[in-house]
Structure formats: C-alpha cells, structure tokens
Amino acid sequence: MNTLPEHSCDVLIIGSGAAGLSLALRLADQHQVIVLSKGPVTEGSTFYAQGGIAAVFDETDSIDSHVEDTLIAGAGICDRHAVEFVASNARSCVQWLIDQGVLFDTHIQPNGEESYHLTREGGHSHRRILHAADATGREVETTLVSKALNHPNIRVLERSNAVDLIVSDKIGLPGTRRVVGAWVWNRNKETVETCHAKAVVLATGGASKVYQYTTNPDISSGDGIAMAWRAGCRVANLEFNQFHPTALYHPQARNFLLTEALRGEGAYLKRPDGTRFMPDFDERGELAPRDIVARAIDHEMKRLGADCMFLDISHKPADFIRQHFPMIYEKLLGLGIDLTQEPVPIVPAAHYTCGGVMVDDHGRTDVEGLYAIGEVSYTGLHGANRMASNSLLECLVYGWSAAEDITRRMPYAHDISTLPPWDESRVENPDERVVIQHNWHELRLFMWDYVGIVRTTKRLERALRRITMLQQEIDEYYAHFRVSNNLLELRNLVQVAELIVRCAMMRKESRGLHFTLDYPELLTHSGPSILSPGNHYINR
C-alpha cells in the first residue's frame, strides 16, 4: 500500500560537494530542494581538494589552449564537444563562485595592479589554476555550505544515505519510465525513509574506496554509479581510475594528498638515493600527466623494491613554501616532516574516477528526471586521464547546465502524491557483522593487486571471479537482514568493482590510466568503453 512520503521536494540532490551544492544554490530561488549528505555536510572530496580550478583568466592564455591541453591529457578519447563546452563556460562559472564569496589568492603585478594568482599543474601549458593557498576545496566547500544552510528553500539532511532510486516502472506507475524519488537511510534513526522528487540529481562523487589505498574520504563508495546502473543507466570508461602520484606515505596519515601544485612550483620526484627519475620517463619531467607520473613511481618502487619514492621542494626558499602551501606545511610538521628542509615520502593512491554514468551537456541520464553531475558522471571531458584541476571545474559547469535544464523542464514534470514505503517485513537484524568487514577488506585488497596501476588479463579474470562470489554473498545478506551503512556501501562498491573490471576487460590496449602488460600498445582507433544494463557491450 502506498503512503505519503516522509520527504517531498521539487529536486532531490544526492551529494553535498561542489557539484551538488552549486546546483542547489542555482535552483533554490525557484524550487524546493533537498540535499542528502552521507556524513557531516562538509565531508566529501571537495573539502579535501588542494589544487584549484582551471579557467582562462590570463590574457596570454586561451580557451583553445585549455581545450588542447585537456585533449592531450585525455590520451585521444576525450569528447571534443564536451571539452569545448566546459572550457568555454569555465570563466563564467568560476566567476559565479567568486560572486558567492569564494576568495581565491591574488597578487600584485609589476604594474601595480592586483590579479588572481594563477599556478600551473601537470598537463597545463599555461598558468591557469585559481586557488586558495593549498586548500581550495575547503574554501569552496565552506562557502557553499554556508550559503546553502542559510537558504530558506534548501533542506540539508545530514547522515542520510540514498539506498536506491525509485523508478516508475518498478513500482507499477504507467507512462514513460522515470525517476520519482529515492529511499533514504537515516543513519541517526537507523530507518529507511521515502523521499519524493520531481527530479533527482546524483552528485555522489567517485568510487576510489574500491581500492586499498586512496586519497578520498571514507564516503567515496560509488553509490551514485551503482544506483544509476540498477535504475537502467549506461556507464562508460570505468577502467580509467586515476591514481594520484603523490599521496603521503605515513602510518598516521594514509590518505593525505600532496597537491600537484607542489610539482607545478618546482618540486622534484626522487629515488631513495636522492636522484631524480621523471626525466627518464617523459620530457616534461615532473609536469607530465598524472598517469605517466604514477606509473613511473610504481615502476621505480617495484624495480628497487622500495616502499616509497620522495617528493622534494626543499631547494625552494622556506618562506615561499610556507606561503604557498601553509596547510601541507603544518600537516607535515605535525607528523615530524619539515617540507622546507627534507624530502617527503610518497606513494600513488586511487584518487579520481574518470568514467561514470553517461550524461549529456545538461547532466541528463538515460532515465527521465534523473541527472548525474560531477565525478559520478561520464561527460567525455576527461577521456582516458583527467587533467589536474578540471574536476572542480566540471562540477561547476554541469551544476550550471543541469540547473538550466531542470528549471526549463520543471513545469512539465510528473507529480505523484504517494510512494510505496520501504518493506522490512521479511528481514531481521544482522547476526554476523564480521562477514561484511571481511568482504570489505577482501574487495579492496584484490582490486588494488589485480585492477590497479598495472593490469593483466589473468589478474582481471581473477578479480571478476572473486567479485562474482562476493556479490552472491552480499545479495543474500541484503535480502535477509536490515540495512546498515556498511552493507549499503559494500553492495554499491562491489557492483562498481564489477563494472570497472568489465570495462577494463573490453579495452585491448594500453591507454591513459589503463595499462595492461598483455596489450601494451595503443590501438589506432578507439573510443569510450560503454556498458548497458542487461547486455554488456562495447560501443567505440
């Protein structure tokens, strides 16, 4: 029997990072918006982003140059239209962020005029990265959170996970297949609630938690990708998971990122004996794209049997380092490492999901009323490798374009008054929570070993066999026991793990972030790896 939902709104946004909150603020003057946040509202990847946002603000730079740099970094399979769409709208979307109160670093030019301080990162041919010292994400997130919490038309539900999307045909509604809301796990009450919405937006971030080592916060469990797949959406390019080259190697800070901007400002990568190695791998040295740098570090670690490599900027003046990287300097100092005096131990770690749910220029998915923006989506911008500081930019541009489309379509959106409640009549409390913990550790370990920086066909086949066994265990557990946060995340992440492996098995070449010893060369013609629910297939 259908009942009135516990929550109802015009637009439900699942995720509270730069993508979700920028969209919420653009919509809220005209629409009622609910934002779901899995943890505290600031606990997402945006808050921890150090580098900055790429946009053309320098008169010596150009949109064409930004486009070409992105296409080169994407290793030949970016969607040129998407790249041009993002680059051409970058400045206006960054200006909107500035208008919201975000403070980027400035400096005084030789002519006495003040301008934004632009830094350069790997893959960029010009200085075009706007930043707030070395904590850009924190500045962006805290500004947007403050605006959202004070807007009368935005409700932020913290500690609330989406369990699954409610799709019309699965609950017996007639007409075109569309999304009508979501079931939501209230972590405070430990109950599943119903939320009706005329439009639903996935802004859930990526899936790097599928790997043992990651720079991401604990919530990056691929929820949006898995829910969209179950709802009937296509996904693409999930074999391209970016491994950030420089995560801190330290037992007390295993997911701490050392920003690309350090290398942009002259830091060197060194072996334990103090010698540089990046010039041996790429003429751009430390400023090569991330996939090349990560593989080089991985290669040197395995060749030397070393636990880590080192990042060294101690040749720069100490005042320069403290001024440009105050957060990193203080963090490392607290761990007994002086960035101004010594090299920092680093390893690669899973950082960014370049593929995701297939969308158009407005973030629309294959299901009517369902949008996906930010890291959860596949727009074609990143291709086989994301260029530094294009990720926050993608969040802003598609937050704007999705808002335009949602507003345009809202007068014609379907409205319903009742939805089926969550059915717990045939489940009981879990009796063996240790099973979930064991499955967590097993999944993340074999994904790191078999589907990491370097892959083989045999490793992928082994991973898929283990994923299939885990899925059977998890599905049985999900069917018989009440949901929990760990169970929901594990169910989603093992689904995304399968999609990652299936995409990787499709690609019979090494391109960008996907490197396999069995197919080390590039194919002459290639394109995105696309999976469709019900029948896995390649569309290139």
From Swiss-Prot:
Pfam families per record: FAD_binding_2 (PF00890), Succ_DH_flav_C (PF02910)
GO terms, molecular function: flavin adenine dinucleotide binding; L-aspartate oxidase activity
Catalytic activity: L-aspartate + O2 = iminosuccinate + H2O2; fumarate + L-aspartate = iminosuccinate + succinate
Gene3D superfamilies: FAD/NAD(P)-binding domain, Fumarate reductase/succinate dehydrogenase flavoprotein-like, C-terminal domain, Succinate dehydrogenase/fumarate reductase flavoprotein, catalytic domain
Disulfide cysteine pairs (residue numbers): none
Effect after changing residue 121 to K: Retains reduced benzyl viologen:fumarate oxidoreductase activity, with 72-fold decrease in catalytic efficiency. Lacks L-aspartate:oxygen and L-aspartate:fumarate oxidoreductase activities
Keyword Flavoprotein: yes
Thermal dependence of function as given in the entry: Optimum temperature is 40 degrees Celsius.
First-level EC class: oxidoreductase
GO terms of biological process kind: 'de novo' NAD biosynthetic process from L-aspartate
Matching InterPro entries: FAD-dep_OxRdtase_2_FAD-bd (IPR003953), FAD/NAD-bd_sf (IPR036188), Fum_R/Succ_DH_flav-like_C_sf (IPR037099), Fum_Rdtase/Succ_DH_flav-like_C (IPR015939), NadB (IPR005288), Succ_DH/fumarate_Rdtase_cat_sf (IPR027477)
Control of this protein's activity: Inhibited by the product iminoaspartate. Competitively inhibited by mesotartrate. NAD acts as a competitive inhibitor to FAD. Inhibited by iodoacetic acid, diethylpyrocarbonate and tetranitromethane.
Annotated SUPFAM superfamilies: FAD/NAD(P)-binding domain (SSF51905), Succinate dehydrogenase/fumarate reductase flavoprotein C-terminal domain (SSF46977), Succinate dehydrogenase/fumarate reductase flavoprotein, catalytic domain (SSF56425)
Phenotype upon changing residue 121 to Q: Retains reduced benzyl viologen:fumarate oxidoreductase activity, with 17-fold decrease in catalytic efficiency. Lacks L-aspartate:oxygen and L-aspartate:fumarate oxidoreductase activities
Disrupted-gene phenotype: Mutants lacking this gene generate 25% less H(2)O(2) than the parent strain.
Keyword Kinase attached: no
Pathway the protein contributes to: Cofactor biosynthesis; NAD(+) biosynthesis; iminoaspartate from L-aspartate (oxidase route): step 1/1
UniProt cofactor note: Binds 1 FAD per subunit.
Domain notes: Folds into three domains: the FAD-binding domain, the capping domain and the C-terminal helical domain.
Additional observations: The chemistry is similar to that of typical amino acid oxidases in which the transfer of the hydride from C2 of L-aspartate to FAD is rate-limiting and occurs in a concerted manner with respect to deprotonation of the alpha-amine. NadB may have structurally evolved from succinate dehydrogenase/fumarate reductase-type enzymes to gain the new functionality of oxidizing amino acids while retaining the ability to reduce fumarate.
Subunit architecture: Monomer. Homodimer. Both the monomeric and dimeric forms of the enzyme are catalytically active.
Function as written in the Swiss-Prot or TrEMBL entry: Catalyzes the oxidation of L-aspartate to iminoaspartate, the first step in the de novo biosynthesis of NAD(+). Can use either oxygen or fumarate as electron acceptors, which allows the enzyme to be functional under aerobic and anaerobic conditions. In vivo, fumarate is used under anaerobic conditions, and oxygen is the predominant electron acceptor under aerobic conditions due to the lower fumarate levels. In vitro, fumarate is a more efficient electron acceptor and is kinetically superior to oxygen.
Name the record gives this protein: L-aspartate oxidase
Source organism: Escherichia coli (strain K12)
